[in-house]
């Protein structure tokens, strides 16, 4: 899309850049000598320096410190779907063990307690880049409170733009049974989106809008940390070729070729994000955006690892959720998990197979989509049988939509790994 601006015709992403940089363009040509850290002593021994303003005092007393804060934006990987709640689950499926929430906990401890920091947790399951951008009905950017301190931002986005759920549904789970479409078609559509420029341009605009929202030219220390995704499978093992994660009897097999292609899709998404980050940083003298690639940290913790019979609901070393599978938080208990879940059958009158699809698609929520597709499948073919194993785990209760939506998302140990990789990246750049 191109827009006429005076005598110039600019692509949409270039127009956004012009708006964000505006009169501050001259700052890009100047050396920025402002420090990027808070120098006060930190309580947590493993924490890196925080991206933040120079200290307003050399005193170690908390009462002399300026209040600090940060924001988390993005999709379900940032929201931490399935990783536990302190109460009723909100519509965004935010989990208490999401890596932004874990960072917020560490951040609060390092600054002297929750009242010394501000954490805006805006990440939402199902979000795309368009839903983060300003002007959308569900805009996370518009929800960001600029009156609160924001010293850095965490961002995770891309999977929903590129059709991760469509690939999972067609190639792995077949929630809509025979009507789920072919795996090849879903993979081709994802590839076409990857090869196009729409996602790149949209991510570019999201980052520039965020810089503009926080008035980056007045906060030279402000930094955006963008996280990627992790490959789902060990693609070298042979035993997984005869295994399936499908929800219906005789679901698709996890053949090596499929695992290789799905892993390649994840790597391509990461590369796209990394290139967009590099493009933005090339406009600035100082780094404004970091890309954190934690994929290798998941080695040994994917599906189809050696000597693992999938689906293995008892393996806590797998960093991704199975359908209805338990979390692997270090202090997790069965009673605690059951207390956090609300049960509902996908075949109850609350799930109308004739009316559920539109709202589910609009929400972008994987769990709502999966539930609706299963209800539609059962209505069309009452003889359908569920796959053997523990698809109906935990006393055969249906936990919706998180029961389904969390599948192939990081469990708590995965989020701890992402958090640690973020810290490692901050340390390596000596922020």
Located regions from the model:
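Structural recognition of the beta-strand scaffold that forms the well-ordered cores
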Residues: 69-81, 118-123, 151-156, 161-164, ...
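Oxyanion-hole/transition-state-stabilizing segment in secreted/luminal serine hydrolases
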Residues: 131-195, 229-244, 401-402
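Mobile gating loops/cap/lid regions near enzyme active sites that modulate substrate access
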Residues: 231-268, 275-408
């Amino acid at each position: 899309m191109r827009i006429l601006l005076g005598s110039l015709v600019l692509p949409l992403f270039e127009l956004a850049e012009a708006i964000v940089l505006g009169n501050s363009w001259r700052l890009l040509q100047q050396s920025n000598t402002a420090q990027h850290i808070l120098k006060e002593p930190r309580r947590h021994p493993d924490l890196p320096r925080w991206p933040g303003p120079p200290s307003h005092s050399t005193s170690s007393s908390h009462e002399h410190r300026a209040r600090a804060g940060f924001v988390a934006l993005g999709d379900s990987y940032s929201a931490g779907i399935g990783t536990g709640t302190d109460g009723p689950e909100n519509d965004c499926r935010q989990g208490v063990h999401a890596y932004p929430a874990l960072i917020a906990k560490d951040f609060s401890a390092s600054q002297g307690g929750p009242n010394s920091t501000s954490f805006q947790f805006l990440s939402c399951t199902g979000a795309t880049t368009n839903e983060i951008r300003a002007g959308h009905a569900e805009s996370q950017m518009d929800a960001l409170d600029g009156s609160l301190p924001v010293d850095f931002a965490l961002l995770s986005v891309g999977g929903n733009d590129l059709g991760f759920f469509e690939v999972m549904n067609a190639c792995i789970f077949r929630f809509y049974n025979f009507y789920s479409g072919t795996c090849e078609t879903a993979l081709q559509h994802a590839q076409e989106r990857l090869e196009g420029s729409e996602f790149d341009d949209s991510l570019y605009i999201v980052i520039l809008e965020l810089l503009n929202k926080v008035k980056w030219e007045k906060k030279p220390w402000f930094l955006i940390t963008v996280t990627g995704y992790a490959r789902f499978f060990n693609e070298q093992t042979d035993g997984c070729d005869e295994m399936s994660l499908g929800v219906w009897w005789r679901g698709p097999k996890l053949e090596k070729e499929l695992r290789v292609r799905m892993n390649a899709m994840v790597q391509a998404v990461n590369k796209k994000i990394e290139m967009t980050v590099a493009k933005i940083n090339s406009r600035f003298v100082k780094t404004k955006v970091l890309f954190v690639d934690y994929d290798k940290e998941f080695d040994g913790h994917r599906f189809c690892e050696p000597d693992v019979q999938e689906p293995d609901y008892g393996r806590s070393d797998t960093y991704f959720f199975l359908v209805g599978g338990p979390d692997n938080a270090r202090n997790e208990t069965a009673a605690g998990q059951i207390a956090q879940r609300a049960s509902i059958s996908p075949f109850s009158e609350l799930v109308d197979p004739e009316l559920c699809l539109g709202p589910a698609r609009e929400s972008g929520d994987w769990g709502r989509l999966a539930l609706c597709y299963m209800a539609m499948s059962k209505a069309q073919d009452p003889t359908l049988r569920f796959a053997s194993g523990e698809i109906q785990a935990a006393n055969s209760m249906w936990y919706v939509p998180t029961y389904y939506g969390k599948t192939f998302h990081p469990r708590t140990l995965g989020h701890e790994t992402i958090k640690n990789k973020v810290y490692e990246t901050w340390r390596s750049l000596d922020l």
